[in-house]
Amino acid sequence: MKQLYGVIGNPIGHSLSPVMHNDAFEHLNMDAHYHAFLVKEEVLGEAVRGLKALGISGFNVTTPHKVAIMDYLDEIDPLAKQIGAVNTVVHKDGKLIGYNTDGIGFVRALQSISSKPLQEKRILLLGAGGASRAIYFSLADVGVKEIDVANRTVDKAKELITACKATVHSVALSLEKATEEQGNYDIIIQTTTIGMHPRVEHTPLQISSLNKGTIVSDIIYNPFETKILCEAKEQGAMIQNGIDMFVYQGALAFEMWTGRTPNIERMKQLVIRKLGG
């Protein structure tokens, strides 16, 4: 019988997940289908119960349901609980189990371009919202010891640092201070929406004094190269946009559901083509 997977959100028509996952199913000769479900906030509970009753094998969760979904699940993975958001649900033994692959997917993507283990790196996170939280906790979970957080509101950066129970050395910085200190970091990760289309001329941090070999990663993928990435490239940094994070988090969800490993590069090239790259 064909296995059913999907993604729930509102809006959902723009999602590239169905294209990516259905291509992977076809490539691996699997009898499965991935569908995008438009689910409004007021019917989230009914939708989740309906998906469970239909026997869905697993599904992704996107805006605006990543936090609210937690009330309707049977179990939640400890890391997802710590992050406070779920983006992947596995239906196993009659239970819906929630995970967060955003942060771990990002960590895998980052490690794929780093010549040394991330545990040896000093990292600066720009932003203190939901994406930053997922990445911070996931970096801490794999043993990264130095992660500073810069945010427009420094108190919010302090809150994020305080919430993490792992033994991480962290300092909360203003964006102005982070601009001054940028040369002290091996990796800079941009997690805000600043620089996203259509406001492409904006940047949270003016890149001016990076060390050779610094990695600058931006979770935005529209445009492919944000202003911060363009400036970093001019300084000789290695850059990475948000496509890698999107693909790796999707691949991790695919592995959780099926026990199979999809072709990451195939997924990435498909997404780039769909985005017009």
Curated annotation (Swiss-Prot):
Leading EC class: oxidoreductase
UniProt similarity note: Belongs to the shikimate dehydrogenase family.
Organism annotation: Bacillus cereus (strain ATCC 10987 / NRS 248)
Active-site residue list: K66
Name by which UniProt lists this protein: Shikimate dehydrogenase (NADP(+))
NCBIfam families: aroE, PRK00258.3-3
Entry GO CC: cytosol
Assembly information from the UniProt record: Homodimer.
